[in-house]
């Protein structure tokens, strides 16, 4: 009648990626989204690893999976060292990517049961760090630009 053979219902995507955001350094990473859903929210203000464990973010294995794994944040400081995970995977000749804010996906499982993984979106803050001359325009205004008319630009 039936076979005792197991049927594969879906596949997970396991990604190793190094994504660049912008010129660094940045102040913080605030959010990681997969598609239209938040996978992580917080305030990552130093280089380090974020662990996300939301395998049911899109409905689990029976639907479109989720996100589960490690994301290594590199904010782009002048003293940023080469990434140890990239060196282990692709060889020791890795730059430090100083002056570049990036994230390394350390093989997380993303999505399942869908041939198109959800796009990743990142919410960053770059207000006080990364100025060309090292001087911020408004440290006293807590990152909120002045609304005085002299600061408005007209065309």
For each of these PLM feature ranges, what is it?
Residues 1-155:
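Polar, S/T/G-rich
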């Amino acid at each position: 009648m039936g076979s005792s053979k197991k049927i594969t219902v879906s596949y997970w995507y396991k990604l190793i990626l190094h994504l660049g955001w912008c010129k660094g350094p940045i102040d913080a990473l605030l959010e990681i989204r997969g598609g239209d859903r938040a996978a992580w929210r917080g305030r990552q203000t130093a280089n380090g690893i974020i662990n996300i464990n939301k395998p049911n973010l899109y409905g689990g294995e029976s639907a479109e999976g989720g996100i589960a794994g490690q994301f290594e944040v590199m904010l782009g400081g002048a003293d940023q060292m080469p990434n140890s995970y990239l060196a282990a995977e692709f060889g020791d000749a890795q730059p430090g990517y100083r002056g570049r804010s990036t994230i390394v996906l350390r093989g997380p499982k993303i999505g399942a049961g869908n041939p198109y993984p959800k796009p990743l979106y990142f919410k960053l803050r770059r207000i006080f760090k990364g100025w060309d001359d090292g001087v911020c325009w408004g440290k006293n205004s807590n990152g909120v630009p002045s609304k005085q008319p002299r600061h408005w630009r007209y065309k």
